[in-house]
């Protein structure tokens, strides 16, 4: 079974192609002996598994290939709403909840969830401010909602416009 959630101290967590550059850079700094906040990285494969389990791949492709935003809007809405409203598959949810509990046990109730898209911080684009970060999360529900919101942020209008400007589509990338 694939590991979808890894501690930042694990060597594999420094893989930006799986976890996105934000998480991978945090992991690499920790591996170099620099102090980092404790945390976990979510594999972008978890995002794809969630999309597939919800039957959203046709909407993903349709939104990505639409030439006009107006043509993509209904598909984007379906993806975003489904990511918020439909259950997270157990193979993804269980390690997320285990990681959350580990953080609560180590650091207390207030947690942070940050997005880490695979294409962030590439040459010529930073994506600064395009996605989401959530601070002060206390409950399990808030934590899971924040993960969902990070996944859905890949489909936000501002992010899509930025990606279009840089010749990227949400179907070509994923969110860790």
Language model segments and positions:
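N-terminal beta-alpha lobe that positions the nucleotide/phosphoryl donor
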Residues: 1-176
